[in-house]
Amino acid sequence: MKTIVIPQFHRAPSGQRGLYNRQEVGLARAFAALGCRAVVLYPEPGTKTMQTESPEPNVKICHMPAAAIGAQTFYKSWQILLDEHADAVHVMGDNSLGVPGLYRFCQKHGILFYSQLSALKSTSGHAAVRWVMDLLLCRNLAVYRKTPTFAKTPATAAELEALGVPCAGLMLVGLDTAIIPSIPGSRTAIRRALKIDENAKVFVFVGRLDACKQPLDLVPLLQAAPGWCAVIIGQGTQGETLKTRLTEAGLIGRCRLIDRLPNEQVHIYYHACDAFANLNENETFGMSLLEAMYAGCPPVARHAPGPDLIIEDGVSGLLCDSVPAMAAALDKTTRTMGHAAQSRVNEHFLWQNSAELALTLLNQKKTWHK
């Protein structure tokens, strides 16, 4: 049985225990379903001992001692790769500073190293940090040029080629359907249970209320779409500002703001709403977008690398250049579009596809390993 290790390099909420949508765990489940073992590594700065979870057979999650500098983390040892008898590491390291060290360890011990990347340039809000990270990126690029490197989106593939890194192909991000609950009942019944007007036109926004997600654009979106109400699920640094601006604009009565919900209830809102709004013009992928589409909730999204890849414009959703265009697009969403969105995810955006592609590399290990 092959063992694939999937390390996370960034200090991020996505790896916290109890959170439902951990991409690495979704991929691990897909590997297990194909007859492999998968070990997910999450960095835990400040801890001294490893703690583990075993959510299902052949899936192991290890919370590892690590050092941290800002969002960057560094594992104190890669010995776990030998302890777990790793055949390969599935690296989603992008510009992480720990990538070169992992590569050297794998090279020394004959472990296949390959990557699935979403972005390379720093997106830090601090110019000095961006400059330093982009300067240090050359270390990662040297590794990616020597190893099979896949892109999560066509935009990333183009970026890799521009930086002199041969792209081995697209390896798309997938949805972990094992964590998605079944939501029984009609939309009318669901709305009654949620106390949402059965006849209202309602879109849902799900995401962090931070600047990178552009949540403040919900204000002009609602102003330009007077016939619509919004369910806004999320919290973040711009949460209070958003609430204030909605109030000042006289829009707060058309909104339901929810800081945090259990996963099951988030999915209930996908089934209750007429459309899903994605405002981030730099969205590299969009897991909430995939979830909404899987529920049959048609998306209206700004053009960005992720939505441009996922949505077939006019078929499984609508792509727009601006907030006014998004407002107009809301009225063009249909149930048929929602069904097409659901089919789109089922056919192209499940983790099984990525896992199957990755396993082909293990059969070519001698060819790839350098």
Regions picked out by a protein language model, each given a short descriptive name:
Residues 281:
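Aromatic "clamp/platform" in nucleotide-sugar-dependent glycosyltransferases that forms part
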Residues 243-261:
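Nucleotide-activated donor-binding/catalytic signature segment of Leloir-type glycosyltransferases, i.e.
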Residues 312-324, 330-334:
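Conserved acidic donor-binding segment of nucleotide-sugar-dependent glycosyltransferases
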Residues 130-131, 137-187:
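Donor nucleotide-sugar binding/catalytic pocket of nucleotide-sugar-dependent glycosyltransferases
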Residues 1-48, 84, 223:
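N-terminal subdomain of nucleotide-sugar transferases
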Residues 197-213, 219-222:
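Conserved donor-binding/catalytic core segment of Leloir-type glycosyltransferases
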Residues 298-301:
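Short hydrophobic beta-strand element within catalytic cores of glycosyltransferases
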Residues 260-261, 268-273:
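Short alpha-helical donor nucleotide-sugar binding micro-motif in glycosyltransferases
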